[in-house]
Amino acid sequence: MASMRTAAAAAMLACIAVVLASTAADGALLPWFGGGGARDEAVPELGLLAAADPFRILEHVPFGFDRDDVAMLSMARVDWRETGDAHEVVVDVPGMRKEDLRVEVEDNRVLRISGERRREETTEQKGGGDHWHREERSYGRFWRQLRLPDNADLDSIAASLDNGVLTVRFRKLAPDQIKGPRVVGIASAGGDDGGKKSIGGAGEGQNQQAKKVEL
């Protein structure tokens, strides 16, 4: 019984290690990412976050993922490049069609890319006599998300798929187009609300809906 528990614990640690490695370039765990530094500048920040609270990684992996899904997480590698006037996110999705993929952008400036590669039904599954000598290809679901910078033009996001490579592009806003923080006036103690501004009604911002990007 003790050996079974030890094996289960080792398997869980291995899965967490795989997910940590696969999300090293993933903005899901970072307050902001993609600001013109080195391509792997997020790795030290991720390490600090993991050291502070190593179980926060579980907040960003959907429940219900199995071993195949963890393998797909390591396959869906992401590159993020910033040019003079645009951002470009490139994801490796070998063997997947556009119908298998979903690209969304949420109101809180989070770009979410997900997909599923399904196993093909074989004659063995249909009751035939197929025999597998080797099975190394990865199947399952993946789920990546990136927090976009303030200069991202959310209305310009477009996605395309070519030879197993998904590319998501969006323009950069000019400095004078970037919305800064909203200044809220403070009422005086005497009740004068001349400078007081509303901060929104009940439930404001609670029902954010993701915008789907067509491939």
Curated annotation (Swiss-Prot):
Its main location: endoplasmic reticulum. PANTHER family: HEAT-SHOCK PROTEIN 20 FAMILY MEMBER. This is 23.2 kDa heat shock protein. May form oligomeric structures. It is found in: Endoplasmic reticulum. Residues 205-215 have a biased composition (Polar residues). Belongs to the small heat shock protein (HSP20) family. It holds the Pfam family HSP20. Residues 1-27 form the signal peptide. It comes from Oryza sativa subsp. japonica. InterPro entries: A-crystallin/Hsp20_dom (IPR002068), CS_dom (IPR007052), HSP20-like_chaperone (IPR008978), Small_HSP (IPR031107). Residues 69-189 form the sHSP domain. One of its GO terms (cellular component) is endoplasmic reticulum. One of its GO terms (molecular function) is unfolded protein binding. The keyword Signal applies. The keyword Endoplasmic reticulum applies.
